[in-house]
Amino acid sequence: MFRLATLNDKPAILQLIAKYIHPNHVYVRRSDLFEYDFACADKLNIAVIEHDGSIEGIFGYFFYNYSLEPDIGGMLWISSDRAQKWSPLAGIQLRDFVLRSVKHRCFGAPGANVKTKIIYETFKKRWMPMEHFVCSLRPSSMPDFLKIRLEPLRMPKNICYVSQIRDFDEIKTLDPDIFYFQCPIKDLAYLCWRYFDNPFREYLLWRVDIGKTNMLVVIRIQNRGP
């Protein structure tokens, strides 16, 4: 049976993560981080495969915005050995259950392997790169579809003004259209949840101005916290 999870399912979900991902997974070590990422009142933004009272699969999701037809992203996808025996496509069916149950305009799969493209196409899904600003200290590790408009981090010929954003109110001074010209669309609630109120991850945000063009560059500080 497929259903949407509640907060009461947290212990069973963490057990599944420990068994099928790693017993020392960050969500297993820090259940408060798990709740920050997935809890919404007494619900969890997770769908589960349940059989005889046992949770045998999970598919997590999050909201990029809270419009009437929001963009959502998928994360934390597990299908147990038992679930695969019942149905080799149990994981795919669970993901499709989420897409049927959660109203949305666009579904994104951050970190999806290019090798899975044929699977999505088999199920008549449209494959397109997510238009994020992606940066790396190693150019060889950058994906082919990397899109940094006007390449602000590569010293464009235009005069480039860079300033660090230290307060959430400064985000509101950016041209809001920059969040609507890319997919997925991010709203202020997402930016606050992800980058400013997040007590578990540390980010640096930079405003880049080239002429009349505003850009937002986000850098995650690694190896701090969980």
Describe the function of each predicted region.
Residues M1-K43, V48-E50, G73, I148-Y190:
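Short amphipathic alpha-helix that is part of the acyltransferase structural core
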Residues S31-F38, F59, K125-W127, W193:
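Tryptophan-centric aromatic hotspots in well-structured domains and transmembrane helices
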Residues A39-K43, D52, I185, N198-R201, ...:
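A short catalytic or substrate-binding loop motif that flags glycine-/basic-rich loops and adjacent residues
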Residues L44, V102-H104, R201-Y203:
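Short, high-confidence coil segments that cap the C-terminus of an alpha-helix
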Residues V48, S54-F63, G73, K212-N223:
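Conserved beta-strand in the GNAT
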Residues N65-P139, Q222-P226:
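Acyl-donor binding region in acyl/amide transferases
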Residues F179, C183-R207:
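Oxyanion-binding "anion nests"
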Residues F181, I185, V217, Q222-P226:
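Flexible internal linker/loop segments at domain or repeat junctions
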